[in-house]
């Protein structure tokens, strides 16, 4: 997994200060670690947005003005309900041997058999919560959809982790991750396809 350096600055926790920061393109946030005091920080909105909307997960080295670096990952992001701008973010620190839970993006591999027959591929879960050591975390989880037919789904429990050592998916095993839906034209031509449920 790639490590990204992100500049941050300490901040004073006040509502008016947070609003002023946001108006100037700065996002307020906090850094926390079990057993340690929470640190209030601010980070550039554009730099943070690139990480949040990336197709890959990252380890983040938070760099302070004095040069100190704290290794972390993004634990939570809050968005404005109307503008969808990032308004707050939580970073969690960790040690090399610590077991963490990290959201890892899902990447699709192969051409679905159902898509070749006119179906539409739908990714239901764009990221999965993975538990393991930071050094073992992948940039993304590759899911092969080659055999996926119309009306069928790939569930969490069907995603193999053979290529990843010591990792565990924490999401509900029965949750569908990817499915193939019948296209409107296909559904009209084949009534059974219209009522097919993800199985």
UniProtKB/Swiss-Prot annotation:
Record CDD domains: Ribosomal_L25_TL5_CTC (cd00495)
A Gene Ontology cellular-component term: cytosolic large ribosomal subunit
Biological process, per Gene Ontology: translation
The keyword Transferase is annotated on this UniProt entry: no
GO MF: 5S rRNA binding; structural constituent of ribosome
Keywords of this entry: Ribonucleoprotein, Ribosomal protein, RNA-binding, rRNA-binding
Top-level taxon in the UniProt lineage: Bacteria
Pfam families: Ribosomal_L25p (PF01386), Ribosomal_TL5_C (PF14693)
Chain's role: This is one of the proteins that binds to the 5S RNA in the ribosome where it forms part of the central protuberance.
PANTHER family: RIBOSOMAL PROTEIN L25/GLN-TRNA SYNTHETASE, ANTI-CODON-BINDING DOMAIN-CONTAINING PROTEIN (PTHR33284), RIBOSOMAL PROTEIN L25_GLN-TRNA SYNTHETASE, ANTI-CODON-BINDING DOMAIN-CONTAINING PROTEIN (PTHR33284:SF1)
Quaternary context: Part of the 50S ribosomal subunit; part of the 5S rRNA/L5/L18/L25 subcomplex. Contacts the 5S rRNA. Binds to the 5S rRNA independently of L5 and L18.
Stored NCBIfam families: bL25_bact_ctc, PRK05618.3-2
Protein family per UniProt: Belongs to the bacterial ribosomal protein bL25 family. CTC subfamily.
Protein name listed in UniProt: Large ribosomal subunit protein bL25
């Amino acid at each position: 997994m790639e490590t990204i350096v992100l500049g941050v600055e300490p901040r004073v926790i006040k509502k008016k200060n947070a609003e002023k920061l946001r108006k100037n393109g700065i996002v307020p946030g906090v850094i926390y670690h079990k057993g340690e005091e929470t640190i209030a920080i601010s980070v550039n909105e554009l730099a943070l947005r690139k990480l949040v909307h990336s197709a890959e997960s990252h380890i983040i080295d938070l760099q302070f003005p004095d040069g100190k670096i704290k290794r972390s990952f993004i634990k939570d992001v809050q968005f404005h309900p109307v503008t969808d701008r990032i308004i707050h973010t939580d970073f969690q620190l960790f040690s090399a041997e610590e077991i963490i839970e990290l959201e890892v993006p899902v990447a699709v591999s192969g051409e679905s058999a159902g898509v070749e027959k006119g179906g539409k591929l739908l990714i239901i879960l764009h990221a999965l919560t993975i538990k393991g050591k930071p050094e073992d975390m992948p940039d993304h989880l590759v899911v092969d959809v080659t055999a996926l037919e119309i009306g069928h789904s790939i569930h969490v429990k069907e995603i193999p982790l053979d290529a990843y050592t010591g990792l565990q998916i924490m999401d509900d095993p029965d949750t569908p991750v990817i499915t193939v839906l019948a296209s409107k034209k296909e559904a009209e031509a084949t009534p059974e396809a219209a009522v097919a449920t993800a199985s």
